[in-house]
Amino acid sequence: AEKRAQDAKDEMLKAFEASPVTREIDAGAENTVNFSKNLMGIGYGEGSLFGFIGFDQSDNPMELVREYLNASGKIFKTPKTIKSAGQIYYQYKVEIPNVKNLEAMTPMPWEGGRSWIRAIERGISGLGYYLLSNSPRSRSTQGVQASRKLRNATYRPTKYISNIVNAYAKYLQTGKKSKLKK
């Protein structure tokens, strides 16, 4: 049970680090390339999730998520004993990350109450107003919101943390890795 739990956690952390969303936000304010391909309709090198979400240039938003995921996976030592067809099975409980807890820990930098993790999965409006700019008014030093629409661009929601957590839970239950879309 401990080996499967550790293997599942290792796979979850590997999937988190390999995610284009994680990598793009982790790249910080210096990166202006949208390699997660969530920002549809903006040119290559004209912005990234880090700038569009509006993180401060000194923020490291992934660190808190990374710490939470690393702290998860506690195995409860007392198993449930199941007897079936002359066999005895032991079922262990493992604490998995809670997406709602992650959402509570990740508020949008400019909009209290809404989570940027949830926004990545559900959608973020205003991409057509996003202007790549090195303006001192920009928190990220990457871009600002223009007063008028600049282009027909849309944010493409993507299953992110929920897919990673669901794959982790499935691995714990079945012992089989899930393929995540990149």
Report residues per predicted region.
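Short, Lys/Arg-rich flexible segments
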Residues: 1-182
